[in-house]
Regions:
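Active-site helix/loop module of the DD-peptidase/beta-lactamase fold
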Residues: 67, 72-76, 90-132, 150-151, ...
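Active-site-proximal alpha-helical segments within enzyme catalytic domains
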Residues: 123, 169-176, 282, 286-308, ...
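Short, gly/Ser/Thr-rich active-site loops of penicillin-recognizing serine hydrolases
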Residues: 304-307, 316, 321-334, 396-417
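Active-site SXXK
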Residues: 22-26, 46, 70-97, 173-178, ...
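Active-site Gly/Thr loop motif
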Residues: 220-290, 322-381
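Short, conserved catalytic-motif segment at the N-terminal edge
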Residues: 11-73, 95, 151
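Flexible glycine/proline-enriched surface loops and loop-helix/loop-strand junctions
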Residues: 66, 152-159, 169-172, 275-284
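Structured C-terminal helix/loop/strand segments within mature extracytoplasmic catalytic/sensor domains
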Residues: 368-417
Length: 417
């Protein structure tokens, strides 16, 4: 049991040989940006070896981050959504090579009739953008977004390009799950993943859990200038090249900027993420609320048995982690302007694989990060499940808090061999 006296309030459990992770976790509170509140958990071979928490869940209210605190994990949600799809595939209820229209006939409009399910998971469906117009209330209601996706024409020939489907991923995969099971993605996750493992994790937060939620704060405004500065620092490229790349990827008319608006439903300056309406909705692309322990436990159960429960068998893990896209090129970039080598990432069926921006703990690792800093992953070879959550959101590219923790886990694993 740890009980910090350095003002960060770091508490928890660390087994012998895992002290480096605790050292990095404490140091994160003193770095730039310094943590407000956070938690980190590591499972190895189905049991926890690190379970840490510290800081404040709500800086304004001076509320401490305790054992029951949960936080928004943003796109780390996508990993949980993908696990749900692969559970159905493992059970023989979902064929990843079948066209989406087998399960969702209305999806076939506007030239989408041949898109296979796997392209929804690998971000190759050509549907990162919804023309709309949609409102936030439409997104919360689910079906208006589904109707828009049914009518949407792909931005390019499906299967030929990879672009991150930041918002639509959750609606696309979630609707397939709903058509097969008759349950929303959030309900399926609660029944088939969270309940068997005893997780404190929800996609669609029950009102009874509101008092546990950490309040989000920001290390700095989410600006193109901030992201550009981080890119210069982490790539070593000259400013003109970085500005050209960032404008192409994140400028106001770029594919990614339009994708993040979901047809006008999301205004990223409105502070909606701290509202009850956002928390209560089911957004399988990015509004799971969880503690670090649950993230680590969930991923651990994909590669090993956890208290008698294993979610996915080795054959399923092998199939779902095959790299489908090597993101060294990105749709919408000017000719000759590729993704810098140390920013490339590799996407399998719903998961990031180990890559330069997020090496995890080894070449076999798979998982998903989230905007603001959260991350969760597993490593089949090491038997690792890892989860990290924070309420101090930073959009700095190369943001080191989670990657430093993962590096410490890697070092501890190495010392055990």
């Amino acid at each position: 049991m740890l009980d910090s006296t350095n003002g960060t309030g770091v508490q928890g459990h660390v087994e012998d040989g895992w002290g480096k992770v605790a050292d990095v976790f404490r140091a994160n509170f003193e770095g730039t940006p310094g943590e407000v509140g956070a938690a980190c958990c590591v499972y190895v071979d189905g049991r926890p070896v690190v379970d840490l928490r510290g800081g404040l869940a709500d800086r304004e209210a001076n509320r401490p981050w305790n054992e029951d605190t949960i936080a928004l994990v943003a796109s780390t949600t996508k990993g949980a959504t993908a696990i749900c799809a692969h559970l159905l595939a493992q059970r023989g209820e979902l064929d990843l090579d079948a066209p989406v229209v087998k399960y969702w006939p209305e999806f076939g409009a506007a030239g989408k009739e041949h898109i296979p399910v796997r392209w929804l998971l690998s971000h190759q469906a050509g549907l990162p953008i919804v023309d709309g117009p949609l409102t936030f209330e439409d997104a919360c209601a689910w079906h208006p977004v589904i109707r828009s996706l049914e009518a949407q024409k792909p931005e390019w020939q499906p299967g030929t390009e990879h672009v991150y489907h930041s918002m639509t991923f959750g609606f696309l995969v979630g609707e397939v799950v709903r058509r097969i099971t008759g349950r929303s993605l959030g309900t399926f996750f609660a029944d088939e993943v969270a309940a068997p493992l005893g997780l404190s994790a929800w996609i669609g937060l029950p009102e009874a859990q509101e008092g546990r939620v950490a309040r989000i704060g920001y290390a700095a405004p989410f600006t193109l200038e901030e992201m550009t500065a981080g890119m210069i620092e982490t790539t070593g490229l000259d400013r003109d090249t970085v500005i050209a790349w960032m404008n192409a990827v994140w400028g106001p008319d770029s594919v990614q900027a339009r994708a993040g608006q979901l047809g006008g439903a999301f205004d990223h300056t409105s502070g909606y993420m701290n509202t009850r309406a956002f928390r209560a909705a089911e957004f399988p692309f990015g509004n799971m609320f969880s503690d670090a322990r649950s993230l680590a436990r969930m991923y651990a159960a994909t590669v090993s048995e956890v208290d008698g429960v294993r979610l996915l068998n080795p054959a399923t893990v092998e199939k779902m982690t095959v790299v489908h896209t090597d993101k060294t090129k990105m749709n919408g970039l000017p000719p000759g302007l590729d993704v810098p080598a140390n920013r490339s990432f590799y996407m399998s069926l719903g998961f990031w694989r180990a890559c330069p921006p997020m090496p995890f703990v080894g070449p076999g690792s798979f998982g998903h990060p989230g905007s603001g800093g959260s991350v969760a992953f597993a490593d089949p070879d090491a038997g690792v499940g890892f989860g990290y959550v924070t309420n101090l959101w930073s959009f700095r590219i190369g943001e080191p808090r989670a990657s430093n923790l993962a590096a410490a886990v890697t070092a501890c694993l190495g010392s055990r061999r």
